[in-house]
């Protein structure tokens, strides 16, 4: 019975109609030469419930590396990244790589690696997945 309570709480918190989802991304609409647009002045709030992903485009040219970042809808971002997949060859001249992500500021600089943080997050994820499976199972019974 407690599982049903957890499922109801989960649904109440995350799946209510009208629940607004907004993400923050780095944005520089014009290509920036050797500037990856990852400083605070490039942070924007994306359009609620429309632009649910961050997009990053990296183009390697003879003059240097060009960056363009923006908010995007998941459909537009995934279509763009799939369309340019064959042109993505990091380190090669005229390479164009487009990537999409859906966590806050994920199109910014890569976080510095820490040895133990990745393994510390895994148990929480496993627990969350277990609770979701239990909730779904109890809902079908």
From Swiss-Prot:
A GO BP entry is: negative regulation of protein localization to plasma membrane
The record's section on SUPFAM superfamilies has:
Snake toxin-like (SSF57302)
Secretion signal, residue range per the UniProt entry: 1-20
What molecular functions are annotated in GO for this chain? acetylcholine receptor binding; acetylcholine receptor inhibitor activity
Alphabetized InterPro entries for the sequence:
LY6_UPA_recep-like, Snake_toxin-like_sf
CDD domains given in the database record: TFP_LU_ECD_LYPD1 (cd23559)
Give the record's keywords alphabetically: Cell membrane, Disulfide bond, Glycoprotein, GPI-anchor, Lipoprotein, Membrane, Signal
The annotated subunit structure for this chain is: Interacts with CHRNA4 and nAChRs containing alpha-4:beta-2 (CHRNA4:CHRNB2) and alpha-7 (CHRNA7) subunits.
The protein depicted here goes by the name: Ly6/PLAUR domain-containing protein 1
Q: Which organism is it from?
A: Homo sapiens
Q: Which taxonomic lineage is given here?
A: Eukaryota, Metazoa, Chordata, Craniata, Vertebrata
Q: Which gene encodes it?
A: LYPD1
């Amino acid at each position: 019975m407690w599982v049903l309570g957890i499922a109801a709480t989960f649904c109440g918190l995350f799946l209510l109609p009208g629940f607004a989802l907004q993400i923050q991304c780095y944005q520089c609409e014009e290509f920036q030469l050797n500037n990856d647009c990852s400083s605070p002045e490039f942070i924007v709030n994306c359009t609620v419930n429309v632009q649910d992903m961050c997009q990053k485009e990296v183009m390697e040219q003879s003059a240097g590396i060009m960056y363009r970042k923006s908010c995007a809808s998941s459909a537009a971002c995934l279509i763009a990244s799939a369309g340019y997949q064959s042109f993505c060859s990091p380190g090669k001249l005229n390479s164009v790589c487009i990537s999409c992500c859906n966590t806050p500021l994920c199109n910014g600089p890569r976080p510095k690696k820490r040895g133990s943080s990745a393994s510390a997050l895994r148990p929480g994820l496993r627990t969350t997945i277990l609770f979701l499976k239990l909730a779904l199972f109890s809902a079908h019974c």
